[in-house]
A protein has these predicted regions:
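Terminal, compositionally biased low-complexity regions
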Residues: 1-223
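Generic amphipathic alpha-helical segments used as scaffolds and interaction surfaces in large
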Residues: 209, 220, 224, 237-240, ...
Length: 373
């Protein structure tokens, strides 16, 4: 059962930085913080969230250290409803493969978290809301006080969708916390935290580059995972209109991959990825089809935010800098769309690694599509 408490004054938000009496203050009315924010998260939790816990009746027997999840919503008069550690969380996810009813879901099955609902809870759009949630030892805090003064802006966005994005960020936090140095090392080696790889493989890959070692250490695992997923990949590009023009060609690339014919597999797949991107660009009515614009196509079509596990902004950068990499005609050293298309990539570059990455790029593009499931 929820608890009901009464604030003397309904909170409006958190002050962004200290000000002196009489000075104007910037108030944060909507925010998401997670464990990676360190003391910023601690300060928020030790403020209003702790005050709420302290207001609960003694029979609740709840301490701040015991909070797994907390949901609070309140009106402008300060009348609040509080739920602590009693709600069932229902997540709506986008999955990598078909799942049967009753089948267990594992982290590696999840492409993204689209919604996070709390069963039996309805939050009025004119109420402020604060939610604390956990994933193991990780904590997340989301609040939206914009329906209250000074904004007085009734909530129109889907609260559960917002929470889903936040929870997804928490679930895949290490992917969002990749350092600039690690990103540079991944791009230099042609790798990306592809959704087609298991989270454990990606974490291992990040660990290698953080230790100044080669991301190629994960190639045997990555190749095995892609090979195991080929039947699912064939189903994916068979069921979406964007891929309908390319299915036969992509199937041929998959056939050559299974046969270990790396020259044929790469010769097919690298030019074909651009064809797929051209189809994707039509979803957002892109007019200019330069390579830099095509690199934006998945992001523009998806409507995804930075919190997505697909890392859409970084994938755009990857497409532009790695897939569409330019080359020195006198010394073409890397396989890319352009080195393959211009016939200057060396035979050594038509490797198993390049074929693995090519198929992973196709899958990553697929899951940017709005109706991809």
């Amino acid at each position: 059962m929820p608890y009901h408490v009464k604030f003397k004054h309904a909170p409006s938000g958190y002050v962004a930085k200290s000000v002196k009496k009489g000075e104007s203050a910037t108030v944060i009315q909507k925010e998401f913080l997670s464990s990676e924010d360190g003391m910023a998260l601690v300060h928020r939790l030790e403020g209003f969230a702790t005050e709420v816990v302290d207001m609960l009746p003694k029979e609740a027997r709840v301490k701040s250290s015991q909070v797994d999840h907390l949901l609070l919503h309140f009106d402008r008069e300060g009348n609040a409803t509080v739920y602590v550690n009693e709600l069932a969380q229902i997540a709506s996810i986008k999955t990598r493969s078909d799942l049967a009813k009753g089948q267990a879901v594992f982290e590696h099955d999840i492409v993204d978290v689209e919604r996070l609902e709390y069963q039996g809870v309805s939050v009025p759009p004119d109420h402020g809301v604060l939610v604390v949630f956990s994933k193991g030892w990780r904590k997340g805090l989301y609040f939206d006080f914009e329906p209250l003064p000074p904004m007085d802006k009734e909530r129109v966005e889907d609260l559960w969708r917002s929470l889903g994005r936040c929870y997804g960020y928490l679930l895949f936090q290490e992917f969002h916390a990749i350092s600039e140095q690690a990103w540079a090392a991944l791009f230099a080696a042609k790798w990306f935290p592809f959704v087609g790889l298991k989270p454990t493989t990606i974490k291992e890959m990040i660990g290698w580059v953080n230790s100044a070692q080669s991301a190629d250490e994960v190639l045997p695992k990555a190749a095995e995972e892609v090979r195991a997923r080929l039947p699912s990949l064939r189903k994916l590009w068979a069921k979406h209109a964007v891929f309908s023009d390319h299915k036969v060609i992509l199937d041929a690339a998959a056939d050559r991959f299974e046969a270990g014919d790396w020259i044929a597999a790469n010769s097919i797949i690298y030019p074909r990825i651009e064809g797929v991107l051209r189809n994707v660009s039509k979803l957002s009515n892109q007019v200019r089809l330069t390579q830099s614009e095509l690199a934006k196509a998945p992001l523009l079509a998806s409507g995804l935010t930075r919190s997505s596990r697909l890392l859409p902004q970084m994938f755009q950068k990857y497409l532009q800098e790695v897939y569409f990499e330019t080359f020195d005609p006198k010394n073409p050293s890397n396989i890319s769309r352009n080195s393959v298309g211009h016939g200057v990539a060396s035979a050594d570059e038509f490797s198993e690694k390049a074929a693995v990455i090519g198929l992973l790029i196709v899958e990553q593009v697929f899951f940017h599509l709005p109706s991809a499931t």
